[in-house]
Every structure is written in C-alpha cells, then in structure tokens.
Amino acid sequence: GDVNEEYLPDENAGYIVNCDIPMTGSTWDDKSDTSLHFVYETDESEEDYDNGYECTALTLKKGDKSATAEEEYFTYNYDKNFLKQYKVVTKEGKEYIYACALSYNDYTDVMVFDINDDDIKLSGVFTCHLVYDTSDPDYYGEFIPTDPENMYFGQVGNLFGTYTCYGRHVVGDDGMPEPADSVYKISWGSEEAKSLKSINVTMLDDKYNEQGEETIDAGEHFLPIRTDNSSFVDCRLDDGRLVRLKITKTDYPVQIDGEDVDDLFEGLVYAG
C-alpha cells in the first residue's frame, strides 16, 4: 500500500542501518575471499567453544584492503553475537562501519572503519558506557544509533561521586563520534546526596541561565541532573529550585570552592 510521505526517509539526510557483515576467525580466513568481512584474532588459551571466543583484535577486510583494531578484547559467540554492526552513511555520502563490542565494566568499544575511496582504514576506537536511566526503571543498556546527526552515548563522570551521563554526538569528518552538545544529562548518580554544611551555589532559572549567588543550608537534598563533565554540576533541590555547583578541582579529591566534595556532602556514590 501507499506510505505517508512524512514517514519516508529524507534523501538528503544521512542514515544508520544495522548490518550483518560475515565474521570468521583468522585460522579459517580464506585469503582469496574478496567480499567485505571481519576477521577476529583469538587468545587460544581462552577459547571456549560453548561460551565463545575471547577476541584480541578485529580486522575488516575486502580483497587486499584491510584495517585492524588492535588490542580490542571482547567475546564473540555464534549464538549470542556481542559484536553489533552498523553502516553509517552521512548526508555528504561518506560511509563508515561501526563495530560495537561490549568491553569491560559495562563499557562498549565502537571500532570505526572508514570504507570510502575503495579503501579500508581504521579511524579509531570510541569508548562509551551503558546507560541506566533512573527515571525509567525498565531502561538499561545501549543507545542504538539511527541518525548520524543524533547519536546518544553514555559516559562516566566523577565530579559529584560517580555518575553516568549521556549527550548527543554527531559523525565527524573522519567518521568518529564527536560531542555535539557541551552539557550531558545525568541518568544515574548520587541520588541521596545531602549537604553537610552551608554551601554557596549559583541559582539557575528553568532555562539553566545563571541568576546570582545564594547560600544553601546544611541538610538540603541535592539531585544531580546535568554536567559539562569539567567545570560544573547542576542539581535540583527538593523544592524544585535549580542550582549550579562550580567545580574548582576536577581530579580526586574533587573540590567546590576549594573544599573537598566529600566534606561538603554525604551520600555520594562511588564506583570502580
């Protein structure tokens, strides 16, 4: 039947589709195979035919063209393929392959292969994190990319305890994901943080514009909601007011106005 035009893809926009490029181990790779395919290296001491292969590198090949992501550790299993593959096509017509492998501690490595100009090159490896959104208890996992101009990836920060945050990314000139926004939404973090003493903060309006300084008393609940992951953390108080904590030292121990964050707050959660 007919399809409503509003649901048809924009021919001038880029897109991302799931793909299923064949995979084989280096032991069985047919050197005469001219099709596009992946070849994985394994640590023979870690091979487990029931649970999969512990891979140590991944190569994308086509004929005599190839590129390898070295020292990429992931499990490949025929029944449960932990390697997700996406073909990324930008609005300029450039094409890339994103090979996404679950790594350690809920991290994902996105291996970016450039397949333009009848060649294969490794642009790099982008590391992101699974996202758990506490506003939706049923949501946990990876964002699935569908739009080169709107890809959302999780990152881990440590400016206010440990937290997971995510933000919009776009495909860069070399195919690598690049941050498009300067602020990330915090999806999981120290939800029970309370001030141990009076704290000077910057008040914000509902558009996150700074409105002036104010002192918040001890015992106030601070819910972290946004951050730039470098200089501030925005929080919501129980009465709905929005405040900004300005970070003056980013390495541990993190400081706000020259005081250690652990001396200012209780209930901060740390992971890793």
Model-found features: residue ranges?
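Short amphipathic beta-strand/extended segments with alternating polar/hydrophobic composition
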Residues: 37-39, 66-78, 125-127, 181-190, ...
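Short beta-strand elements that form the blades of beta-propeller/WD-repeat-like
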Residues: 14-50, 92-105, 111, 141-164
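Surface-exposed loop/turn elements that mediate protein-protein interactions on large endomembrane-trafficking
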Residues: 54-76, 111-129, 167-182
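Long, charged/polar, surface-exposed segments that mediate recognition or autoinhibition
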Residues: 85-129
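Terminal domain-start segments
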Residues: 1-81
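Exposed regions on extracellular, virion, or secretory-pathway luminal proteins
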Residues: 29-33, 43-50, 63-70, 79-80, ...
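Acidic, small-residue rich beta-repeat scaffolds with periodic aromatic anchors
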Residues: 1-19, 23-26, 136-272
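Repeated scaffold domains used in trafficking and secretory/extracellular systems
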Residues: 78-88, 127-146
